[in-house]
Structures are given as structure tokens and as C-alpha cells.
From Swiss-Prot:
This is Decaprenylphosphoryl-2-keto-beta-D-erythro-pentose reductase. Its EC number is 1.1.1.333. Disulfide bonds: none annotated. Component of the DprE1-DprE2 complex that catalyzes the 2-step epimerization of decaprenyl-phospho-ribose (DPR) to decaprenyl-phospho-arabinose (DPA), a key precursor that serves as the arabinose donor required for the synthesis of cell-wall arabinans. DprE1 catalyzes the first step of epimerization, namely FAD-dependent oxidation of the C2' hydroxyl of DPR to yield the keto intermediate decaprenyl-phospho-2'-keto-D-arabinose (DPX).
Amino acid sequence: MVFDAVGNPQTILLLGGTSEIGLAICERYLRNASARIVLAVMPGDPGRDAAVEQMRKAGASAVDVVDFDALDTESHPAVIDQAFAGGDVDVAIVAFGLLGDAEELWQNQRKAVQIAGVNYTAAVSVGVLLGEKMRAQGSGQIIAMSSAAGERVRRSNFVYGSTKAGLDGFYLGLGEALREFGVRVLVIRPGQVRTRMSAHVKEAPLTVDKEYVAELAVTASAKGKELVWAPGAFRYVMMVLRHIPRPIFRKLPI
């Protein structure tokens, strides 16, 4: 049995096991029912122990930790095998990523390649593996953290935005590919979220708390949605921006 009798997940895998948004989503699921949590964490991540304790306090029935280096794609099959070794995984949350300094990224080849490797290549790598596992078990929910920055890539953060555009397209397509096998994929496009990663960035309009994103993720998953914005109003903002001609778009202070 995968989900319990009322649709609550029994095992949740968080790839990016110290992600504030990812942990908030796990906490929101645990408010409904206890579950086993598997945290896939970068070796040596200083937030590892705190994340485990956070999940225990939130009501997890068990918390397992597996080492996960996003850039070491050769190790990913073993990581996913280990995560599924204890039985079916009902929900897998893809919530790892880098933000970086926008102006440095397009002028530093090493860092540009690194962020592309983490935000896009690694996301594709684990997505393929999760799809394979969940297809075999005949069920499952993947939640992929995208970004409004990928909807129309802006000059102000185009390296980061381009990686999220790629992730977004991949997971939307993966959802289409897996539909017939009983596996669902939800892509979440948040604007700015109040976390440690964005603490140094000037707060933008429509900024939301991680708890808001978590509530949206769990609710949208239960409804079988494939794509949601956080907040919902961002959808209409980006709908307008997407159709602005490039010469005009270039002059906008965004």
C-alpha cells in the first residue's frame, strides 16, 4: 500500500533535505498524518542535524538520511535506490538549488556551469530516476520547485532564470509522460519566498512565506494539479510580461 486509506503519504522523500521550502512542505504533510521522511542531503551540510530534528518534532514516524551530491550525477542511481530501499515512496520533493550572484554568474564560467549543473542537470537526473521508480510502483507524486524567474528570463538574473526555465519544461513534460502510469507531477512556480537563500535580496512585491508555498503544494497535489503559481496572482503578472516586445521589456526595471 502506498498512500493511506484517506490519501496521506506514508513515505516522503525530500531531495534537498535542508531546503526550508521542502521541509515546510514535509511539515504540512505531517500535520495531516505521520509519515516516514527521507532527507537526501549534501554530505557535510551544516543544516543536516537541524533538519532531522525539525522533522521529528513535526511528527515524522521515522527520519532517514541519505547522502546526496547534486553535482555527482553518477551517484544518483544509488541515492534513489537507497531512498526507495525501505519501500515505496509516495511523494518526492525536488527542492535543491543554487541562487548565486546574478552579475557574477554570467561573467564566471565555473560558477555558471555549477549552477546549471545543480539547478538543471541534477534535477533532470533525479527526475528520470524518480519517474522510473514510481512508474514501477504504479503510483506516486513528484513535486518540483521551479520559479517564476523561468517563465520569461530577465536580464537581471538570466543565468539562474534559464536553469529554472529548463527545470520547469522538463518536469511539465515528465508529468505528461508519466500520466498513463498513475504518477503525477506538480510544478510550483513561486516568486520570491522568504528564506535564508533570499535574505540578501531586496523583497519584491508578491513575496510569500514558505508556509504559504507548503500549503499550496499539499493542496494542489491533493487536487491533482500539474502547475501552480505562488502566489496565484503571479500567473497574471507573468502572462503580461511574457507578451511584452523585447525592446520594451529591455527597458523595464525588473
